[in-house]
Design a protein with these regions (language model features):
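Glycine- and acidic-residue-biased ligand/ion/polar-headgroup-sensing regions
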Residues: 53-55, 62-66, 73-93, 132
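Short secondary-structure capping/turn segments at boundaries of alpha-helices and beta-strands
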Residues: 44-48, 69-71
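His/acidic/aromatic-lined binding-pocket segments of jelly-roll/cupin-type domains
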Residues: 49, 73-75, 80-85, 100, ...
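Alpha-helical bundle regulatory/interaction domains
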Residues: 1-46, 55, 92-159
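Short linear motifs in exposed loops
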Residues: 60-61, 111
Length: 159
């Protein structure tokens, strides 16, 4: 039995330019990271995970930053569904066509077919990235960016 492919990207300890370049490259299929707040500190983060077929599961930690997904990025990258469980931290902003606030213990349902514009706090998350083709028949157009408390707790426990 062969082992599953793994992802491991750490920016801790790298010089600022290399850390930003690495973090930007890791996020490129999903978002553009931008400095947030008055100081606009260079955005950095780390991700480690596993690829299971077409699905990616990863633990992701990052400093406070803005995440942007615009029409240009949408046109040239996959429009997967990103389920993002925030263990710590959270964000405010627009995902899945709605203004949303997500905090610790909550799952963000991010439809990458639409623009994203969020301001994130320093966070630790578990991410599940599912290709749209695996969700055939699921009415994603009715999906909300937040789950009701029961479904959120059930999905968070499962993740």
């Amino acid at each position: 039995m062969s082992s599953l492919p793994r992802l491991y990207y750490v920016t801790t300890g790298l010089d600022e330019a290399t850390a930003f370049a690495t973090w930007s490259a890791v996020l490129a299929p999903l978002f553009e990271p931008r400095g947030a707040g008055p100081g606009k500190k260079t955005p950095t983060g780390s991700a480690s995970g596993v690829i299971i077929g077409d699905i990616i599961i990863a633990k992701v930690t990052f400093a406070a930053q803005d995440f942007v997904r615009d029409a240009g990025r949408i046109a040239v990258t996959p429009d997967h569904l990103l389920l993002h469980l925030y263990m710590t931290g959270g964000f405010n902003g627009e995902i899945t066509r709605q203004q949303t606030t997500i905090g610790p213990g909550k799952v963000a349902m991010i439809d990458l077919a639409y623009p994203v514009n969020t301001r994130a706090f320093a966070s630790s998350t578990i991410s599940l990235i599912v290709p749209r083709m695996l969700l055939d028949g699921v009415p994603l157009d009715r999906m909300k960016p937040r789950l009701d408390p029961f479904r959120n707790d059930l999905l968070a426990a499962h993740i």
